Amino acid sequence: MIDLKHGDCLELMKEIPDGSVDMVLTDPPYGTTACKWDSVIPFEPMWEQLKRITKPNGAIVLFGSEPFSSALRISNIKQYKYDWVWEKSRFANQMLAKIQPLKIHELLHVFSSWKVQYNPQGLIEVNKVTKQGKKVTDNNGGGVRKSEYMQTHTNYPRSILRFKSESNTVHSTQKPVPL
């Protein structure tokens, strides 16, 4: 069941029970345009509510773009885990093309109070023994220490995600569903 609500997110989140959400995925305003709706949500009350509603091992994933992204990560550095980079198929800042590079990416920031669940997609099973040599320097001139391990899979996801930008969207910042 989908229950859509319209209103102030900080007020609406107060209706959500403590520790009841597995994952929050949201695209907050970045405060990088002159649009009326593009006002940054105050970080302190936002984090207070997000931490309250999320399960201990739950994930909080927020879209962002600089300089908003840096401020967002710093605002909750203790829970910050890593970023994904969404490489879009269309650039966004054509009006600034003569003074800065065209922006063709957005960031997804992953936060969690504990070890965030990570389920890599698209793995290929290999099950082979891999040897790894490592140069070791010590007081006797160094040497090579070799180790073996069982590599079970390959094709692990990388930090850059490539998904086509949506066209004819309902909202100007709408993201593609497959992303």
Could you say what each language-model-derived stretch is?
Residues 1-179:
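Core catalytic lobe of class I
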